[in-house]
């Protein structure tokens, strides 16, 4: 609602690169801007502090209302959701109806060298081919794990089958190039 949109600073919500593609489509439809950070609520909060934003969160459910807390807080999130439900006289399912969650497949592949695997021209070409095939109906994200020798390949598309196929296509190239630890 407009009352709640006006509470956003610069009409912006902070998310991570792993937030569902459907969330971004819903934000676009509602005229809400978003800032994307690396995965981790510490990066979400850092972006919020650096830019003065009030609302941010991760797909994992860590929702941060910077006016009330510095970390995700389930009780605050529940209270804020109830506040909106009461003000709009709508159920949670009615509020969430415009949000179409896209099927998502995320696979990890253990590699010898995360950076080399991700920067390889053939791997990049495979990723670009998937991105081109998806167009505006999905997305691909390939990123290094911050804690282990793993490259994460994530695809969101119209069907689970599409996601599986595209993720497997990219992983096949990583394996063909000899980066995978078998």
Show the residue positions of the predicted features:
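Short, small-residue-biased leader/transition segments that mark boundaries at the very start
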Residues: 3-4
């Amino acid at each position: 609602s407009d009352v709640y949109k006006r509470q956003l600073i610069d009409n912006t919500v902070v998310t991570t690169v792993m937030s569902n593609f459907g969330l971004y489509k819903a934000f676009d439809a509602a005229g809400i801007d978003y800032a994307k950070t690396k995965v981790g609520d510490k990066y979400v909060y850092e972006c919020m502090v650096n830019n003065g934003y009030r609302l941010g969160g991760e797909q994992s459910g860590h929702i941060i209302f910077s006016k009330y807390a510095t970390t995700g807080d389930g009780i605050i999130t529940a209270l804020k959701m109830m506040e909106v439900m009461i003000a709009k006289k709508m159920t949670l399912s009615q509020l969430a109806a415009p949000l179409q969650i896209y099927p998502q497949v995320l696979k990890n592949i253990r590699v010898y060298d995360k950076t080399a695997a991700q920067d390889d021209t053939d791997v990049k070409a495979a990723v670009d081919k998937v991105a081109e095939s998806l167009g505006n109906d999905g997305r691909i994200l390939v990123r290094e794990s911050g804690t282990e020798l793993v490259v994460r390949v994530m695809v969101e598309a119209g069907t689970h089958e599409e996601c599986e196929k595209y993720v497997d296509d990219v992983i096949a190239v990583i394996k063909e190039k000899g980066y995978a630890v078998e």
